[in-house]
Structures are given as C-alpha cells and as structure tokens.
C-alpha cells in the first residue's frame, strides 16, 4: 500500500482529447510535498508516513512543532497529514513526492473539506420536496412538515433530517481518473469535481476499489533531499537501481 500526497486545489478547467471530446478536470498542485516523519510498528503500533506541504513561517508555530521539523531537517509546513502504508512502501524523510507518483489513467480517491453553506433549510440541505404551492398552504411552502409520529413514539428520533448547518464536512470522492500530470509545475489533473474551495487542502490516495496500475511507481516517485534522482517507476523496471 503506497503513500498518498497532499495537494492544493487550484480550480477547474477542461482538456480536449485527440477525438475532440472535452473532459472537465480539477487542477491540483503539489506544493513541495515532503516526508517529514515515520510511524513504525515497533514504536507507534502501525506503519505510516507523515507528509507536509506548503510553506509556513516558523515564528507562528509552537516550539514543539518547530522541533519536529528541525529534527527532520525539513522546512516548516502549513499542512501535515499521515498516510498508512505497508512496510515496503517507506519513503526517506526529506524526500519530495512528485506529481508523477500517479500515472495517467489510474483512479484515485480524493478527500477534502466541502464548501460551507451556512444555515440551510430542509429543501436545500436534504433535497426535501417542500409543501404545496397552494390549496391551503400559506407561508410554510418550504418547511419540512412533520418531524415524527403522535403519542407513539411521542418524540423526534435522533439524526432526523432537519434544517441546520450545511457544508464544512470531510468529503471523500472515490474513483476519479488521472487525466494528466505535470512534473515541472507539480500539477495533477483529475477528471471531475473535487470537494472544497479554491486553495483548499486536498489529500489524494490510490483508489481503494480499483487495482493499482502496473506502471505505478513503488514505493513512489520522489526526489531525495540531497537532490538525488527520483525513484524508478516500477519494481520490475528498477532492478539493480538505487533510489
């Protein structure tokens, strides 16, 4: 199981195929996504990589966080996230994961925070039909109607769909196809919409419900902290090579 990446949502556009078909895509930017720490089974009980992305001034950080980045010899990051990985998918601390970590055509799961909509009624929040436009209904056309029974059960059950705060939820969109990658600019183009607003932080992982392409790099495509070469593409293509 490979690591995912932290990206920032740039916006949406469309790309054209050779056949003239247009594909709506979301542009995600990998802003210096580096490995800042390891989680091992012996010490932590599980195996994971801690990644960081984006620049942040150390003066605005707690001393404890500054110390963690100092130990890792990595510049302070604005966004930090953990990704569970298998023991054979460990990437060295300080390595920068590239956009070609994902290959064109593979499917990914994208997680982000949805756009906040404030206080919303039942029709907007839950797609309720509302009441009738006429025939005795006045003022309450967009109300939700009854919320429960009579004397039995004599209450409104928990988790009943009602008006309330809408948005700012953690949303995962499954099986989005990778359309293009741009290593030089650190861009990843995925088909369809991605949850969140422009500039929001997004995590991208290999799709859980789709097979990983053979061309995908293992443990990943990355650039070492000392400026070394990136890891080679696939295990069978990297025999005898060092990362």
UniProtKB/Swiss-Prot annotation:
Coiled coil: none annotated. GO terms for molecular function: rRNA binding; structural constituent of ribosome. Residues 139-164, 218-243 are annotated as: Disordered. Pfam families: Ribosomal_L3. The keyword S-adenosyl-L-methionine does not apply. GO terms for biological process: translation. Residues 218-229 have a biased composition (Basic and acidic residues). The keyword Oxidoreductase does not apply. SUPFAM superfamilies: Translation proteins. One of its GO terms (cellular component) is cytosolic large ribosomal subunit. Transmembrane segments: none annotated. Residues 230-243 have a biased composition (Low complexity). Keywords: Methylation, Ribonucleoprotein, Ribosomal protein, RNA-binding, rRNA-binding. The modification N5-methylglutamine is found at residue 151. Methylated by PrmB. One of the primary rRNA binding proteins, it binds directly near the 3'-end of the 23S rRNA, where it nucleates assembly of the 50S subunit. Part of the 50S ribosomal subunit. Forms a cluster with proteins L14 and L19. Belongs to the universal ribosomal protein uL3 family. NCBIfam families: L3_bact. This is Large ribosomal subunit protein uL3. It comes from Afipia carboxidovorans (strain ATCC 49405 / DSM 1227 / KCTC 32145 / OM5). The gene is rplC.
């Amino acid at each position: 199981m490979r690591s995912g990446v932290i990206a920032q949502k740039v916006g949406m556009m469309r790309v054209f195929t050779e056949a003239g078909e247009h594909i709506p895509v979301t542009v995600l930017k990998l802003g210096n996504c580096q490995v800042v720490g390891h989680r091992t089974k012996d010490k932590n009980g599980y195996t994971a990589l801690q990644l960081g992305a984006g620049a942040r001034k150390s003066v605005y950080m707690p001393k404890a966080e500054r110390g963690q980045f100092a130990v890792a010899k990595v510049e302070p990051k604005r966004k930090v996230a953990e990704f569970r990985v298998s023991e054979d998918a460990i990437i060295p601390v300080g390595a920068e994961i590239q956009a070609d970590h994902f290959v064109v055509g593979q499917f990914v799961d994208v997680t982000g925070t949805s756009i906040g909509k404030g206080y919303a009624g039942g029709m907007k929040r839950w797609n309720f039909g509302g009441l009738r436009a006429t025939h005795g209904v006045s003022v309450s056309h967009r109300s939700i109607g009854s919320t429960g029974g009579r004397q039995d059960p004599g209450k409104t059950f928990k988790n009943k769909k009602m008006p309330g705060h809408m948005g700012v939820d953690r949303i995962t969109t499954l099986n989005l196809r990778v359309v293009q990658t741009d290593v030089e600019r650190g861009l990843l183009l995925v088909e369809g919409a991605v949850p969140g607003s422009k500039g929001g932080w997004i995590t991208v992982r290999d799709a859980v419900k789709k097979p990983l392409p053979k061309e995908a790099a293992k443990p990943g495509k990355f650039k070492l902290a000392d400026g070394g070469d990136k890891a080679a593409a696939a295990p069978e293509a990297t025999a005898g090579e060092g990362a």
